[in-house]
């Protein structure tokens, strides 16, 4: 309730400075010195920018989406009206060894080639003068690296395509760079020519992206294999197993949309993919909480009273909870994205060519990381309560040799161990993800938390190893999915007697589907 109240108060607060709705900072230019008309419009480089595409800014956005405080100035969304070209330095300066030098001499201007090829949205290629036909952006922050590489399109393997929307495609590795990731500048070449050449950071980020993709794809394959085993092995298709499958399905969808975003394959339906990815990740957390809730219920009550707390069809109730609440959260996030006027409080799904919820500032804590932290805290409570129960049971039955009590203790411990594994796996990995977000501007911490990122991307692989590559599960797979798990060799008469004594069906657990109720 407090978080909701704080969010409402934030929405009601007046904006400290306006931003242009629907316009990325990297699509704007500084128009402070341009003539202003009485209707609020500006005339910039022969382009009339209407009042609704202008706003006052008191910051400069850096390549990593962090903000640097600067003097208040007016910016216009010129790139929505005419194609822009993003320069590294002032427009008439040259660049050598990643540094900007003074303006070109008259002789250099005479031999300089001022034209660039621009690919339009219909696929046609036109030749444009950088100054006369395009809007020059020269006040944006350079890509965040001390040394940049450049492309000489006259050399084999150095071809590139500059698109009308400002993005640049490197042909040799098919990577499309946004205006945050590259800039162009006049450059002297060995043949004594001066041409406009794109500059970009070393490819470590691309290598990281490749390894990220490898880790996620392997996880996706392992999730499919894990789901297949749980569907194939009859003994695993109990209530816990079904909840586990739903958890894996939502985790699969979350990773699927994440890898699409990494390689920009979802750009055609960017906003839709962002909301679907958001829903999937939230659903995975709620299904993890379902497992914790159900185990807590089993630990809290005697088995003959279990049916009094659970609804007649608990799996249906769990589905309503674990899919329904994330759906409501997604609807709220979508509504906020449409109606909230303060740009700093909008989720901004799909902003900056990133087909995910915007993570460039603390707003993500309201819509994404905040709910995630609450669910992690809830699961910690479930874990502590279950641990206390296990401890008390172990203490109470110490010295007893009654077989059913001993087996009950073993089964409870097995179920708790499963929940503990899942909690540590997902809770810890996403906790590191949130920590990584909070410390993203501190390079030393960012490097240290890189291993946590790979741990997060490899969740599906770890689940497969922990839950499938076990002797008991492998034995069931080899036996055709019908053999009882080890430790379940009780005759049918004793099982029937136990069933009648408890008056309720035994759901079993992920670890041991034949566990006592």
Swiss-Prot record:
Regions of this protein lying in the Cytoplasmic compartment: 234-242, 294-319, 385-414, 481-517
Disulfide links within the chain: 23-77, 79-84, 88-183, 89-100, 145-201
An annotated GO cellular component: membrane
Gene Ontology MF terms in the entry: G protein-coupled peptide receptor activity; G protein-coupled receptor activity
Transmembrane segments: 213-233, 243-263, 273-293, 320-340, 364-384, 415-435, 460-480
One GO term (biological process): response to starvation
Record keywords: Cell membrane, Disulfide bond, G-protein coupled receptor, Glycoprotein, Membrane, Receptor, Signal, Transducer, Transmembrane, Transmembrane helix
Subcellular location(s) of the protein: Cell membrane
Chain ranges on the Extracellular side, renumbered to this chain: 19-212, 264-272, 341-363, 436-459
Residues with attached carbohydrate: 39, 117, 165, 456
Family of the protein in this entry: Belongs to the G-protein coupled receptor 2 family. Mth subfamily.
The protein's name in its UniProt record: Probable G-protein coupled receptor Mth-like 4
The encoding gene: mthl4
């Amino acid at each position: 309730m407090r978080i909701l109240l704080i969010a409402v108060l934030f929405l009601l607060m007046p904006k400290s400075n306006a931003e242009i709705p629907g316009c990325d900072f990297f699509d704007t230019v500084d128009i402070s010195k341009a003539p202003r008309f009485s209707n609020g419009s500006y005339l910039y480089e022969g382009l009339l920018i209407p009042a609704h595409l202008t706003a006052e800014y008191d910051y400069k956005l850096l390549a990593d989406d962090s903000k640097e405080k600067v003097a208040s100035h007016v910016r216009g969304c010129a790139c929505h009206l005419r194609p822009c070209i993003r320069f590294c330095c002032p427009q008439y300066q040259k660049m050598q060894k990643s540094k900007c030098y003074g303006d070109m001499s008259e002789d250099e201007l005479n031999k300089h080639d001022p034209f660039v090829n621009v690919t339009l949205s219909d696929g046609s290629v036109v030749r444009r003068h950088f100054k006369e036909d395009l809007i020059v952006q020269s006040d944006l922050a350079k890509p965040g690296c001390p040394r940049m590489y450049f492309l000489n399109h006259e050399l084999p393997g150095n071809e590139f395509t500059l698109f009308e929307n400002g993005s640049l495609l490197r042909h040799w590795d098919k990577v499309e760079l946004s205006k945050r990731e590259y800039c162009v500048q006049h450059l002297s070449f060995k043949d004594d020519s001066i041409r406009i050449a794109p500059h970009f950071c070393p490819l470590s980020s691309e290598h990281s992206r490749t390894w990220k993709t490898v880790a996620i794809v392997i996880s996706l394959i392992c999730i499919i294999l894990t789901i297949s085993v749980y569907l194939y092995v009859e003994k695993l298709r109990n209530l816990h197993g079904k909840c586990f499958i739903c958890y894996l399905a939502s985790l699969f969808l979350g990773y699927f949309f994440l890898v699409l975003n990494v390689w920009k394959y979802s750009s055609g339906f960017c906003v839709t993919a962002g909301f679907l990815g958001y829903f999937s990740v939230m659903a995975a957390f709620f299904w993890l909480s379902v497992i914790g809730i159900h185990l807590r219920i089993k630990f809290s009550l005697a088995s003959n009273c279990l049916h009094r707390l659970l609804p007649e069809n608990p799996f249906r109730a769990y589905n309503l909870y674990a899919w329904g609440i994330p759906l409501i959260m997604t609807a709220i996030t979508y509504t906020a994205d449409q109606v909230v006027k303060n740009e700093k409080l909008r989720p901004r799904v799909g902003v900056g060519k990133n087909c995910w919820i915007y993570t460039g500032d603390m707003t993500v804590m309201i819509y994404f990381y905040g709910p995630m932290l609450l669910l992690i805290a809830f699961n910690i409570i479930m874990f502590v309560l279950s641990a206390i129960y296990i401890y008390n049971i172990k203490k109470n039955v110490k010295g007893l040799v009654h077989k059913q009590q001993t087996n009950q203790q073993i089964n409870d411990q097995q179920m708790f161990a499963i929940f503990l594994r899942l909690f540590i796996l997902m809770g810890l990995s996403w906790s590191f993800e949130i920590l990584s977000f909070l410390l993203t501007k501190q390079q030393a911490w960012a490097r240290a938390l890189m291993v946590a990122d790979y741990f997060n991307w490899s969740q599906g692989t770890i689940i497969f190893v922990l839950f499938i590559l076990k002797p008991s599960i492998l034995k069931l797979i080899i036996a055709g999915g019908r053999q009882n798990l080890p430790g379940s060799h009780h005759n049918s008469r004793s099982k029937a007697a136990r069933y009648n004594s408890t008056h309720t069906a035994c759901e079993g657990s992920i670890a041991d589907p034949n566990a006592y109720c």
